[in-house]
């Protein structure tokens, strides 16, 4: 069978996670319209009788403002090493500028063959897409093809998957056929909660939040009890997350619980607590150990 690892590279908010979800035909990765939603490297496994593709979703490559951002970029760049193929993704509407050139440099340095992906083509005209294609072909030294996609409309994703499979080697099956990610339930829960915070809050709030699952335990009545802490930088942010009379934390909790119940196939009691850890985004221990960046850089 055809098997291999396929890393995604691109600046924040080009639709890398949405693209993977569209290709595998289910929501595995959290998504939002805000940049830097993805913080960790996540393997998404797509298996059939003929192939197993392991998509390595990565944080957007950007110039960081905090230590957290530095580790995110390290995780993204390290993911480009040792894979069989790279999908270099750009946003058709944003075009190609300095941030894209920054990404292209890292991709070229990896010496790994790449497929250029022009995503969000539904937002621009054909002429602009053709111009972007020519630039990508010129700037990406190991580019084997360019594919035009719209992840939200599921356009071009089948063509992209076919091209990926065509360029993967014959090899062993790395993961069981029913496995869709190598991340544990605690990680998936923290990501779902964080996605809801991204959805319901604005400006700096989503980026100032870390979600750490402290306990997962099945109770005697069969309900899965999950306790998680939501960490923020400042007391004012804590007040926004909790909301007037607890309305915001209730909304976040209800929406997250519904998705977690779908994930585990059973009833869930989600116990959320909001705590302040000042300047946590610049503290190495929290970033490396509690958020798991240490493993992302080593993988």
UniProtKB/Swiss-Prot annotation:
Cell compartments where the protein resides: Cytoplasm; Cell inner membrane
Cross-referenced Gene3D superfamilies: 3.30.300.20, P-loop containing nucleotide triphosphate hydrolases
Binding-site residues, GTP: 10-17, 57-61, 119-122
Family of the protein in this entry: Belongs to the TRAFAC class TrmE-Era-EngA-EngB-Septin-like GTPase superfamily. Era GTPase family.
GO terms (BP aspect): ribosomal small subunit assembly
G2: region residues: 36-40
Coiled coil: none
Topology in the lipid bilayer: Peripheral membrane protein
Organism annotation: Thermosipho melanesiensis (strain DSM 12029 / CIP 104789 / BI429)
Leader sequence segment: none
Domain (Era-type G) ranges: 2-170
Gene Ontology MF: a single term: ribosomal small subunit binding
Protein name: GTPase Era
KH type-2 domain segment(s): 201-278
Residue span of region G3: 57-60
Quaternary structure (record): Monomer.
Domain of life: Bacteria
InterPro entries per UniProt: G_ERA_dom, GTP-bd, GTPase_Era-like, KH_dom-like_a/b, KH_dom_type_2, KH_sf_prok-type, P-loop_NTPase, Small_GTP-bd
Physiological role: An essential GTPase that binds both GDP and GTP, with rapid nucleotide exchange. Plays a role in 16S rRNA processing and 30S ribosomal subunit biogenesis and possibly also in cell cycle regulation and energy metabolism.
Keyword Metal-binding: no
Positions of the UniProt region annotated as G4: 119-122
Assigned keywords, A-Z: Cell inner membrane, Cell membrane, Cytoplasm, GTP-binding, Membrane, Nucleotide-binding, Ribosome biogenesis, RNA-binding, rRNA-binding
Renumbered residue ranges of the record's region G1: 10-17
Region of interest: G5: 149-151
PANTHER family reported in the protein's UniProt record: GTPASE ERA, GTPASE ERA, MITOCHONDRIAL
GO CC annotation terms, alphabetical: cytosol; plasma membrane
